[in-house]
Amino acid sequence: MVRGSILLVMIAFLGGGSAPPPTILAGPASYADLVVLALGAPVVVRATIAKAARIAPDQAAGVAAGSARVLVKATLTTAILAPADVPAAIEYLADVPVDIRGKPLQLKGADTLVFLRGGAGGYALANARGQIGWSAATEAAVRRVIAEARRADPVITGVGNAFHVAGSVPGEAESQFFLTTADSKPVSLVVLSRPGEAKRLSVALGEVIDEAAGGVAKETLLWYRLACFLPRVLPGEASGDAALAADYAFVLQVLGPCGRTLP
């Protein structure tokens, strides 16, 4: 998967006077970017681009070099998220790259997922990069994010308290990290070490901390909120405890990088 900015990729084709094929809109650079798009848009649709007309440069302020602003007209395929009915034809502005001739890439016919704000009075992209290529896998991931968001799981803001306790036998130990959340819901991470066993991370979403609690599945909303919003080092006095610091480093290693590139 391409990392960094969301790119528009042109399919190579042979000349001969025929119209060029549509530009294929790439998907997001990471799962985290997909979460940013899905959570930041009150309207999410799948649509086919029918037309993309360039806006005159003197009427398109703030367009980055190498890009052009176009008025996109698209035909609705399906509404994935919408507070009200979405019309069969929608319009919105988008900034897209230009080719070597300075012309916007060909978008007509592109199958796309669009993340929008607005309503019957008109739509706008909820994120400057809120127009991405459709695929069954990407749509399924968007639907999962939206469904998980409706469960109102805690929004992680940082680490509160932490402690480390050695076990009764050499090599046995447990570290617990109590996280802070936007709504004060309890969340804790437990790192358990036992002789002859691999170190294990589990997460507890509640007051009760159970050794049987599960781990953190990748590419879930909980994983995103942990991987992208936990600090890189322990705050306060906990950072001076070598055992706690080592187990916290293990937490970050298990979670892996956030991968978010979108604002």
Per-segment meaning from a language model:
Residues S5-G15:
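Bacterial N-terminal signal peptides
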